Amino acid sequence: MKSSMNRREFLRSGVCSGTVVAIGYHVNSAAAADLKSPNEKLNIVAVGTGNRARADIDGVASENIVALCDVDANILGRAAENYSSARTYRDFRVMLEREAEKIDAVVIGTPDHSHAPDAAMALRLGKHVYCEKPLTHTVFEARTLAELAKKNRLVTQMGTQIHAGDNYRRVVELVQTGAIGKVREAHVWVSVSYGGARFTTGSPVPKQLDWDLWLGPAPERPYSEGVHPNYWRYFWNYGTGVLGDFGCHYMDLVHWALDLRHPTTIAAEGPPVDPVGTPPWLIVRYEYPARAELPPVKLTWYDGGRRPELLGELRDRHGKPLDWKSGQLFVGEEGMIISDYGRHMLLPADKFADYKRPESFIPKSVGHHREWIEAIKNCATTTCNFDYSGALVEAVLLGNVAYRSGQTIEWDAEHLTVRNSREAQQLIHKEYRKGWTL
């Protein structure tokens, strides 16, 4: 029977569903059969318009950008110059309320602490969501967004654009076809450091900035120079440190290749905990349980210049040390793979000199933003939907929980509970400022 629902009504009805698969996005064919031409453009609004958010807006510019929102009038104005037909707002809540009946999807590129309220409101309104990494500021928020997306059957994507690269796909293929045997150990490291954060006082709020809206759900406090627009990542109230910022990119590959979701034990070490600022360095040790035929995995994260000791023992095919500033190292029973965003290498180099790589089975990405757009139009799901990326972000943020609590935590993912530490449990979520809700 022919449906009387037109395409735009269909897109807004929230009927898209599907199960994520590692090789691409899965189409709900029964529902998609009713869709008209995918050439019809989506109506999209953006929350946040500066820095990375601007790249996200440009990434979906093939569609109709109907409204832009930013708490900084100067940044908003610069973005609006390129999207002159877009209506502009300062408060995302006002924008979503006024535009709800006109839009299909929302792109979110705000500081970490405001991701979840923005995304939750959009999902409850039945809008498809693209949200920058890390998906949320707390573990509880990540679980909440994943559940909302599933309940409302919406197409979601976390902004980890490295996931769309060819290099990650080739590494996943090597690991999953057994090139280095079973993997029980992995290391991830980055050289970045975000330590030394301090609030300042006495500076007036810039005229173009609505500081109250910028704070959003965070605790109320006087304006602090430098926090906006660049250094909020250094503060616990707004950011998630190096681990939250880069873990979503680098740990993504390990989660993807080894089919990881929820660790059961997390321990962290670093300098004494600063209640204000994130640490200049951190080491986190995760333990993941067995998955079907796959063995348990120990994954170690390093930042701020710390790196795995094993890295110092490795050599390339010319015998030179592998002095990689950032990367991933998979340690298998029959060899190793070292990788980063754009390269990878099988080790020992002499053992794999004549290795014949498996035939590629993960299709080339159409682009991280494009994948989300096409998934919406074809009633599909994406490779970094909130089910996959939510679990990844939960694991990433649990490293911060372990560090800040000073505890080796035993994690019950099903019940979202730290079994052995009341202090750590209090860090699974946060109290929202009056007037703000998840």
Predicted feature locations:
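Short amphipathic alpha-helix with an adjacent loop that forms part of the alpha/beta core around
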Residues: 94-101
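Contiguous beta-strand/loop segments that form the cofactor/metal-binding neighborhood of enzyme cores
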Residues: 32, 170, 182, 187, ...
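Beta-strand-loop-alpha-helix segment that lines the small-molecule cofactor/substrate pocket
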Residues: 111, 116-164, 178
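N-terminal Rossmann-like NAD(P) cofactor-binding module of classical short-chain dehydrogenase/reductase
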Residues: 106-107
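Hydrophobic or amphipathic alpha-helical targeting/insertion segments
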Residues: 157, 173-174, 183
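Conserved SAM-binding strand-loop segment of SAM-dependent methyltransferases
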Residues: 87-91
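N-terminal secretory signal peptides and thylakoid transit peptides that target proteins
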Residues: 1-18
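N-terminal Rossmann-like dinucleotide-binding module
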Residues: 16-83, 162-165, 254
